């Protein structure tokens, strides 16, 4: 017969194995949620039969038209990127619903009991047969209809919760209408700091020095998602920025694959600087990268600008003028 101590040890080992096996996940703040929603809409609305109608529905939290692949895949995109659907397990993750609420409930209006109900509903759904858009959508659609008020609340779409969050966090998070670049500069090159004198040349694609520059590049690379959650280089995201300005991404993909294979750095800041140097050192890439990076700065002010029609058709001269205006404010 096992002793109580041995049962306790087995229980601890079992829990440890479960924790180790489970993918790491962090609750999502308003900036992250807006980024996810905008990207999923950008990806799937063009594939709808009526893109404008689909976008209008999705922005109003209506998963319609429900029989279209675009809506089903948009739904899966949202659930998977937020982390409420885990493809490795083929199931909805109730524990993450609770973690989201526990992390941010001081800002939100969600009722605790209703959050528990939503958590239980997720957990009672058995693992799916596949991670296809239709299977994920069909597993989730009734949950969405029944618990929409709670879902919106824990995802900062309940009125003023996002506003409370942004006010509380201040300059520590990217504010609405602020570019990722300016946000990172204000943290790592603040007014009055010794490194502030370097900011003007840094904004003109010259390399900065020391830890402040490493911190700045890490912040920007994370903000524009050139780094993923594990601080690994996301070459597809860099390539996407090239296509946004009408440039072929083949050269930059090859250059960054080569750079990635040679980089030995593990510190995220030093690694970001190494990758940035690679982008500026390759004569086949540098000019197009600078153009793409400028445009990314402008687009990072408003994640919804492209899908709402607020983003003007791309013009290199117009973007350069906007960036020059920002430079003029920073170089004083």
UniProtKB/Swiss-Prot annotation:
Any single Gene Ontology cellular-component annotation: extracellular space
Comment text on domains: Lipids and biogenic amines bind independently through different binding pockets, with lipids binding to the N-terminal pocket and biogenic amines to the C-terminal pocket.
Function noted in UniProt: Modulates blood feeding of female mosquitoes on vertebrate species by binding and sequestering different mediators involved in the host response, such as biogenic amines and eicosanoids. Binds dopamine, serotonin, histamine, tryptamine, adrenaline, noradrenaline, leukotriene B4, leukotriene C4, leukotriene D4, leukotriene E4 and U-46619, a stable analog of thromboxane A2. Inhibits platelet aggregation induced by serotonin and low doses of thromboxane A2 analog U-46619 but not by high doses of U-46619, collagen or ADP. Prevents leukocyte recruitment.
The name this protein goes by in its record: Long form salivary protein D7L1
One Pfam family here: PBP_GOBP
Subcellular location: Secreted
Gene name tied to this protein: D7L1
Transmembrane keyword on record: no
Family designation: Belongs to the PBP/GOBP family.
Binding positions for noradrenaline per the UniProt entry: 185, 203, 294, 297
Note: Antibodies against the protein are found in the serum of individuals exposed to Aedes albopictus bites.
One Gene Ontology molecular-function label: odorant binding
Tissue: Female mosquito salivary gland (at protein level).
Record's keyword terms, sorted: Disulfide bond, Hemostasis impairing toxin, Platelet aggregation inhibiting toxin, Secreted, Signal, Toxin
